Amino acid sequence: LYYGDTIMENQTKLFQEMIDRAEAAVRKEISTWPEGTWTAEASADSDGMDLTKPVTVRGTLTIKNGELFFDYSATDPETTGMLNVHDYMTRSTTCCFTFLFLGEELLRYHNEGSTKPIHITTKPGTLVDSSPDAKIAAGVALTGCLIGEVVMSLLSQAIPEKAIAPYSRQITVNTVTIGKPGVYVTFCPSAGAGAVYGNDGYQCCATGSTLGNIGKTNIEDEMLRFPWEYIKYEFVTDNEGAGKWRGAPGIHYQVENHSTGRCMHQTGSWDGFKTSANMDKFAETAHALDAAGVP
């Protein structure tokens, strides 16, 4: 194809029009929200290095003149563990979770313009704006969830008719078999997504930073490829918690290792997660992992 000047100019105008329309639509929606300031925080048990010290993401939201102002300056300093994230990760996660509150009508049309009314402040050297040499291997999956919880808490306080409860936190990142080598990323012995105003939570989604885009793979396929047997993998009964709309039920997860070596879950302090979300002014989300004795 030959792209002459006229065609390129027309394409540029078209793309700019798409960006401008997205910005205008987002500003129009935000302008219907009440103005004010709200605060929230979410914590992990530790950074995986100092097991006695929790790490916390703290955020403030101000809504004014059809714009959103998120400020994470009060977040804890970056850590020696692998839970740090860089500034661009925080910005991306904040925008993604904000889009959840902007309605289905705009769902397919978000682009650069959608981010223009969203202003994000971070403090260099903190958990959410770490230095270039900080460890970040688990940052997106783990601290990303904390950022998402803070955003959902802030916006749920501001516009309760659009409230979203937290996703469950992941129990295990991966399973390592020693003897017959293998690494298996489970993603989903997690309970699932929290309730949304007007709707029950959705079971068996992965952690919040995936926005539900990752789910459990087929159990039979897993048992063919890896040397362990699923004894139980089913929803837990009566575990959703009180509320007008239920959360996800949680998972009863039990696996038997059939390899010649030992098999271990990398979890607990390694991933730095509490097993339930802990958000100020927000209902907690519960997990169940029977094999690990997690209530």
Describe each PLM feature range.
Residues 1-295:
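Glycine/proline-enriched, intrinsically flexible loops and inter-domain linkers
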